[in-house]
Amino acid sequence: MMVCKGEIWLVNLNPVKKDNEMGKIKPAVVYQSNELNHSDYPTKIILPLSTSLIDGAEPIRMRITKRDALEQDSDIIITQIRAIDNDRFIKKLAHLTHQELKKVKELFDEVTL
């Protein structure tokens, strides 16, 4: 399975260990470099999406509109970054635009620097 940075995939985030961790089967943005994505590395870094929208929540969240197989407008949860095993990827839904991916990086930098 070929997974690329900026793609939105349906992933299995169960089980979770804490109440404040996102679980379920849900969409997520691949945020790992393609150098690692296209290697034999066993995990990928993702940012989960939520359809429970919160207006004005930047830099914690970034809104994206529905597209392709992503059926609802969603918020990318910037602060819920995590690595998941490659076996947790179910199917590709869509991808971010170059501008959206750039904005994700800006928001990620804002909450981590």
Map each language-model feature to its residues.
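C-terminal terminal-subdomain/extension
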Residues: 1, 66-113
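Short, charged beta-turn/beta-strand-edge "cap" motif at the junction between a beta-strand
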Residues: 14-18
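Compact nucleic-acid interaction/catalytic patches
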Residues: 19-25, 29-66
